[in-house]
Amino acid sequence: MDYGILGSSDLDQCSKLAAKLQTNLLLPLIYPLIRDGQFKSRFLQKRLEKCSAEKGDYVRAFMAMFGAARPYVTMQSCKNQFYSDLITPLPEGIDVPGTEIHIFYALKMGAKYRARYQQHFAHPVIHEQDLQHEELLACYPYKWAQLVKSIAEQRV
């Protein structure tokens, strides 16, 4: 593999107990949004609408990218993905000969994410974007595609 590309990933990791607690607490709140396209909780739905009004295009584009209702996605499937994402160990200093790791770093996520990228990858190529989490892909898909293309064409 010549390139690995991460798009403002959080690389969250935690213990099995913490992952189980997070999964069991958060998934019942989030799952209706995935399955039905909206929160079951009126409070959360109103917060989403308020956030959408305040942050405008970013939240709308993120939700559009996230997609509409997915009635075919099961709670168990989401639970498995959410939990396994948190407990899958990611070693430090990953360095695969012949592979460049490129990271689309959304500066508005905070400096702790840059530190995580540098912790887990020996020589990451960090592409800074003055954006929020996944905003490049959600709001500027053409720019995202151009960046991916420019990375892929480096060794052609």
At which residue positions do the language-model features occur?
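A short helix->loop->beta-strand "cap" motif at the edges of active sites that frequently abuts
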Residues: 2, 98-100, 123-124
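Flexible "cap/lid" loop of the alpha/beta hydrolase fold
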Residues: 2-34
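Hydrophobic/aromatic beta-strand patches that form the interior of the parallel beta-sheet core
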Residues: 4-5, 102-104, 127
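Short aromatic-enriched loop/helix-cap "lid" or pocket-rim segments at secondary-structure transitions
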Residues: 15-20, 114-116, 139-141
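Conserved alpha/beta-hydrolase catalytic His-Asp/Glu region
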Residues: 34-94
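Conserved serine/cysteine hydrolase catalytic core
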Residues: 73-119, 136-137
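Catalytic histidine-centered segment of alpha/beta-hydrolase-like enzymes
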Residues: 128-145
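C-terminal alpha-helix
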Residues: 146-155
